């Protein structure tokens, strides 16, 4: 993982031994012994936000293969880029959350069975509080979740971008998001 970060290589990061078709593709933005932050790129070689994972969930990393090279080439040919921010290598998660909060980006928190999406209200060493927004961009309450229950955190992926567009549209049209 560190090699891919240091050499700026597009990597495929695998998290589920039971489902090898599911992987995250992109540049490793930051990593340490416990955390990995991926500047995610979709299957069309386009910007797809950031995905945070616990390093212990990663069981395989591929790089320099045909697929990774294709995605990297498309990303360059399409003049794609990720917003620049300098995550603190000692605390990648909080760097990402501060970036999302300051940029007013939607965040999705996933556990084994569920996911919740929303705007950050607050966060601490033990929990995250979101103003939740449903898939239609409508405000749906407040969720407080224990960080120990969260497996994956996504910021500004295609899904969050679409929901944010809907939420912004609802707000502009006088609806409560």
What are these regions (language model features)?
Residues 1-23, 37, 42-113, 134-177:
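Short glycine-rich, low-complexity segments
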Residues 35-38, 126-131:
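Short aromatic-glycine-enriched beta-strand elements
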Residues 28-36:
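N-terminal mature ectodomain segment of secretory-pathway/periplasmic proteins
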Residues 22-29, 116-122:
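Short beta-strand-centered aromatic/proline hotspots
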């Amino acid at each position: 993982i560190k090699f891919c970060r240091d050499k700026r290589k597009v990597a495929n990061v695998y998290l589920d031994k039971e489902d090898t078709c599911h992987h995250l593709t992109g540049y490793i933005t930051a990593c340490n012994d416990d955390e990995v932050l991926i500047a995610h790129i979709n299957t069309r070689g386009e910007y797809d936000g950031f995905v945070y994972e616990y390093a212990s969930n990663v069981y395989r990393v591929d790089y320099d293969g045909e697929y990774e090279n294709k995605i990297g080439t498309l990303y360059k040919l399409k003049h794609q880029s990720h917003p620049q921010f300098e995550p603190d290598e000692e605390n990648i998660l909080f760097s990402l959350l501060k970036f999302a909060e300051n940029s007013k980006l939607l965040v999705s928190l996933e556990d084994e069975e569920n996911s919740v999406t929303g705007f950050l209200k607050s966060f601490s060493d033990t929990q995250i509080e979101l103003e939740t927004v449903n898939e239609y961009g409508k405000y749906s309450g407040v969720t407080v979740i224990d960080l120990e229950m969260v497996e994956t955190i996504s910021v500004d992926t295609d899904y969050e971008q679409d929901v944010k567009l809907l939420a912004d549209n609802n707000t502009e049209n006088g609806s409560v998001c």
